[in-house]
């Protein structure tokens, strides 16, 4: 074998081994029961289970992915909210995104008809949440969702939380475009409005952010992970206690504006 083909073989084996590892920690009753796509030694989370389920779909395990999505729909709250772990507030948008990716792979219209009522209930929950925060001047969090996105108790209008919400609403509009154009337009308009509010808040954050040096000698503004704070929280520009999980950089590197790439 050539060096290139050997490397490709190793990569292929690693990918397939990863899939089997995830299969080992996905629990449920065969042949058709709901599956729980756990995160190692703790339960499924809409955000952290999303790449697991989407990886399964990308490898052709569409039935497994569908049953794993079912976990979040089975446990959905009566008001449409989805939450399974440690008070995390971002699962609803992340699950809607994963549903959209599943539909992109499968175009399973029978499944879409089955999940549509619960999917729309989740959308209406996000819509009402957004409406509660449409107060004050545009920018600095207007119309954005507020709540914690990970282990730290940060109940702010974060870009991670809202990036997932936008992506979820956008995927719902995409899924319904052919079968229910009127409903699709409603959620496309809602997603686009959230995107505009997100961009205005992000630009406001960039305007007030300090600049930091880059590797090529240039400087760039470094915004905060949420609205209303000046720059990366690890710089303590506006004070606060930000040490968590053995690092000062966790919030800025893992929970911040990088999720706006979804737009």
Question: Can you annotate each of these PLM segments?
Answer:
Residues 131-138, 142-146, 154-157, 164-263:
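Catalytic cores of carbohydrate-active enzymes
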